[in-house]
Amino acid sequence: MKEVLKIANTSIFILIFFFNSSCKNQENSQVKNNKADSLAEVQKHLAENALKGLDISDGLDVHSFATEPMLKNPTNIDVDERGRVWVTEAYNYRPAINGNPTNPKGDRIVILEDTNGDGKADTAKVFYQGPELNAPLGICVLGKRVIVSQSPYVWSFYDDNGDDVADRKEILFQGIGGEQHDHGAHAFTFGADGKLYFNFGNEGKTLKDKNGKTVLDQDGEEIGPKKYQQGMVFRCDPDGSHVECLGNNFRNPYEVAVDSYGSLWQSDNDDDGNKGTRINYVMPYGNYGYKDELTGAGWEANRTNIEDSIPQRHWHLNDPGEVPNLLQTGAGSPTGMLVYEGTLLPKEFQDQLIHSDAGPNVVRSYSLQNSGAGYTASIINILKGDKDQWFRPADVCVAPDGSLIVADWYDPGVGGHQAGDQTRGRIYRVAPPTASSYLIFKQDYSTPAGAVLALQNPNLSVRYHAFTALQTFGNQSIPELEKLWNGGGNPKMRARAFWALVKLPLIDAKIYIDQAVKDKDPNIRMVAIRAAAELKQNLTPLLITLVNDPDVQVRREVAIALHHNKSTEAAAIWATLASKHDGKDRWYLEALGIGADRQWDLFFKSYLTLVKDPLKDAAGKDIVWRARTDEAVPYLAKLAVDEQVVLKDRLRYFRAFDFNAGTLKSGLLLKMIADNKNKDIGLNKLVLFALDNKSVNQSPIAQQALQEVIRSVFGTQEYIDLVKRYQVKSESNNLLQLAISKKDENIGKQSTGLLLSFGGSKQIWSVLNGKDSIAVKSLLSSLGQVGSKESIDIVQTIALSDKYALDIRKDAARKIGRSWNGEERVLAILKNKKVPQDLI
C-alpha cells in the first residue's frame, strides 16, 4: 500500500506554509535590537522572553501588556474608552484544514484590563464564549455594543447591565461567504462621520441583512457577484442601513482605516508568494484590479499590454479602470491598520498610516505625501520580529493615551489556514520611554464641552462616545463644536467638529458645508464635498464652485461626486474637469473614470465640445484611452495605428478596445487588417485579440489574417489564446503535437485541455493505443495536469487496465493525482480498494 501512495503521488496532504520574508523594499529600518541571539530556541518562545526577539524604533519602547495564559491566538483587538483591550481569540482555527484540536465550548471574546496603570493587564474577563464562535476575525467596541465579524455573520453583542458579560446578541449582517476562511468578514471601524466602515475578502461574495434579504447598495442594486467581484469595502449607518459598496475587486483587504477627513485606506494580500502585497487609498466606487474586470480571469491570464512584473501584473495596473496602488510592499500577510491622529508617538508617525503585517513580522508606519490627485508613501518600521519570527502582529490599535496596542498571533507560520501553535498569544504596548505608565483618564461626556474635548481623542471608542453624546445634545452642542470648527487649529480636529455639526439631527447642514467649501485648507474643501454627497444635498452648486479649484485633490473629489449623478449640469462639470487632466496623473484619470461611469456617452460628447481635438496632447489621449463609449472608439483607432509611435507604446490602445462594448469598434478593427498592406503580423495579432468571434468568422480577410498569425505564434501562449478564442478546431493535430512535445510546460496542459474541448479524445486515444511509448508517457503527463473529468477518466483507464504495459500503467497511476481533482480521484480509488495488485 505504501507504494500505491507513492505511485499515485497523493494520499493525505498536510500543507504547512511558513512565511520567512524580509520585505526589505522601501523600508527604513530605524529600529533598536532587544537581542535574543543568546537564547535557545525553546527559551526564545517563552512569554518572559517575548521582548528579547523584538526590535523597536528609536524614541519608542515596547512592553508586554498581556501574554498567555491570559489569552491565546488573538486575531483582532479593539481598545475601549477605558483603555481595556478586547480580544477575539481563534483556538478553533480552520480545524478541517490543519487537523488541530478544537474546544467544543467555542472561542472567546476576552477583556484585558490594567487596573493599576503599570502597563500590564491584571485581569482577563470572558465577555462571551459560545460554540458558534469559531475564529472570528473582527471586533469593534461601541459602548455597550460590541460588533464581532465571523463569516457568515456579523453580530452585535450587547452588555445591557454593564457587568462586562454579553447579555444578548443580534445579527447585523449574514450570508457572507468565507466561513472558517481568512478571506471572509473583517472588522468594523467607526468613522468621523458617524458611519461604520468594514470590508470582506474575496470569499465574502455577498451581504444579507438580519432577515436574510440581500442588501442593496447605493444604486438600489444587489450587493453580489452580478455587479461586484472579489473583496469589497463598505460604509453603512450604525444600524446597518444605507449600505454603500465603496470599492471592489480586492483580494483580501483585512481592515479599513478611516481618517478624520473621511479618506479610506487599507491593505490587500496578494496570491501568496508573488510579492504583490499592496496598500490602497480607496477612491469610492473604484475597481481595484485583482481579477480582470471584464472576464474575471486571474492576473496570470495573458492579455494585451500585460504588465512587465508579477507584482504589477497582479493588480491589472495597465488596464484602464484600475485605481493605482498607493504602495506595494512585497511579500506579506497584511492585517490591521489605523490612521494615527494622536500626538504621543514621535512626529514621524503622527497623521500617518500604521499597519501590522504578520508575514514579515512587522508593525510599520507608511509616511504619506501628496502626489497629484493621489499619494506616495515610504515605510518606517516601528516594531519588528527580526530575532523571533514567531512574532505575528495580527492587529494594531490606538489607546486613549495615544499609545499603540499590538496583538501578536504568535506562531511559527502564517497563511494557508495553518496554526502551528494554539496556546500562545501576546499583547504589546508601544509608547515613548516617558509614557511607560498606562494611565487612562476618565472622559466627561455629560456636557457638550467635555464631549468636544473627548472628540479630539485618538482612540475610536472615545470618539464614538463623544460623537454620540454630541448628537444627543442636539443644538446644545453647536457653540462648543463651533469653537473647534472655527478655531483655526489642527485641521483634522476641525474636520471632526464639522462632521459632528452637519450630522446634528435638526441642523441645516448646508450652513457649514458652504463654510467648508470656502475654507483655505483643501482637506476641508474635500470634506465639504464628501459630507454633501453623504447627506444627499444638491451637489450641483457646490461642484460648480469647486470645479476649477486650484488643488487637484479637491477636483478629484468633484469628479468622484459625479458618480451616477444625473443632474443636467453633470456632463459640463465633468468635461471641465477632464480638460484639466495633465496627461500624467493616473489617480486623477481614474477619478474621472469613476465620475463618468454609466454616463460615458453624454460626458465624452460634452468633453469634445470643449477640447475639439482630444488627440492633440497626452492628456486627451489618456481620456480617450480611459473612455468607454463609441464616441471615443474612432479616436482610439487612430491612436492604435499611429506609426509615428512605436508599437510597444500603442499596446495600451489595443487593450482599451476590450473595454468598449459597442459594435462600432469591430468595423474599425477589421479596417485595420484591410489597410495593413504590408501584412504586419504584429499589428494583425493585436487586432485579432481585440476582435470578437462573430466579426472574424464573417470576414474572409480576418480569417486569412487569423491563419497567418496562428502559424507565426505556434507553440506560444498567444497561439493557445487565439485558437481558444476563435475555436479553431482545424488546429487539433497541432494541439496534439504540443500536448506531447510540451508535456512539462503549461502549454502542454492547455493544448490537451483545448483538444479535449474540441472533441479530440479519439486523437488522444490513437496515441495512447499506439506503440510510441515516449509519446504515450508524454501525453499522459499533459493529461494528468488538465484535471477535467474526461482527462482523469482517460488516465485512470490506462492505469487500471491490464491491456497496457505495466510501466505505462504505473506511469499513468503517477499522473492521476497531478491536479486537485485528480487528488480527489486517487483518494476515491484507494478508499474503494480499486487498485490492482500489480500496482501495489
Locations of regions flagged by a protein language model:
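Beta-propeller domains with acidic blade repeats across secreted/periplasmic ectodomains
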Residues: 25-450, 469-472
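Hydrophobic alpha-helical membrane context
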Residues: 18-21, 96, 420, 537, ...
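N-terminal functional modules and adjacent low-complexity/disordered segments of proteins
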Residues: 8-14, 46, 55, 649, ...
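Alpha-helical interaction segments
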Residues: 7-9, 55-56, 117, 577, ...
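Bacterial Sec-dependent N-terminal signal peptides
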Residues: 1-32
